């Protein structure tokens, strides 16, 4: 049964949205990390198992470094260091 208020109308439940703490950009935090299309091990963290580039809101990158990651992944794909689609092993 639905809860009812004194006026007889159904009560509205307050829905709380849970926001996780914003991840910091790992490249801004550690200046020794470089984005290079030849470093496949670093680029793997920014690609899903289906071969898609992980969005900024999930990876936690800042806009500048997300653009650099995107370009590095595209370069690595063009010279066959990374797969375009799923089903190809990265090893």
UniProtKB/Swiss-Prot annotation:
GO cellular component terms, A-Z: cytosolic small ribosomal subunit
Question: Mind telling me which residue stretches traverse the membrane in this protein?
Answer: none
Signal peptide positions are none
**UniProt GO molecular function:** small ribosomal subunit rRNA binding; structural constituent of ribosome
Q: Domain of life of the organism in this record?
A: Bacteria
Entry's InterPro entries? Ribosomal_bS18, Ribosomal_bS18_CS, Ribosomal_bS18_sf
Q: Mention one GO biological process in which this protein takes part, according to its record.
A: translation
Write out the entry's keywords from A to Z: Ribonucleoprotein, Ribosomal protein, RNA-binding, rRNA-binding
Stated role: Binds as a heterodimer with protein bS6 to the central domain of the 16S rRNA, where it helps stabilize the platform of the 30S subunit.
Family membership: Belongs to the bacterial ribosomal protein bS18 family.
Question: How does this polypeptide assemble, per the annotation?
Answer: Part of the 30S ribosomal subunit. Forms a tight heterodimer with protein bS6.
Tell me the protein's name. Answer: Small ribosomal subunit protein bS18
Q: Lineage of the native species?
A: Bacteria, Pseudomonadati, Thermodesulfobacteriota, Desulfuromonadia, Desulfuromonadales
Gene (UniProt): rpsR
